[in-house]
Amino acid sequence: MAKKSMIERNLRRIKLCDQYKEKREKLKSIINNKNLSIVERFTAQNKLIKKLPRNSSKTKIRNRCALTGRPRGVYRKFGLCRIVLRDLCSFGQIPGVTKSSW
């Protein structure tokens, strides 16, 4: 089980990412627009770096297990780590998932 502080930190990052998503997209579109002058693009890049919080970036978010908070071995489709997924599948808790045999 992950520390509660790590899970809470990740949740705060998700909220910040959602909050600043539109601003970040606008600034990135200005930065990537080749038709604008270099000065305008540079000022937009400075705003992106200095004005927005560092944790509002999408790359800071970590995929974690919904039940245990484990950061590694998480299946995106289920939102669960491999250990919990195996346990739930073996008990038949996840519909449509069967043990394969060949």
UniProtKB/Swiss-Prot annotation:
An example Gene Ontology molecular-function term: structural constituent of ribosome
Gene3D superfamilies per record: 1.10.287.1480
BP term (GO), one: translation
Keyword Chloroplast among UniProt keywords: no
GO cellular component, one term: small ribosomal subunit
Keywords linked to the UniProt accession: Ribonucleoprotein, Ribosomal protein, RNA-binding, rRNA-binding
One Pfam family of this chain: Ribosomal_S14
Keyword hit for DNA damage: no
Subunit details: Part of the 30S ribosomal subunit. Contacts proteins S3 and S10.
Family note: Belongs to the universal ribosomal protein uS14 family.
Role: Binds 16S rRNA, required for the assembly of 30S particles and may also be responsible for determining the conformation of the 16S rRNA at the A site.
Protein name stated in the entry: Small ribosomal subunit protein uS14
Species this chain originates from: Wolbachia pipientis wMel
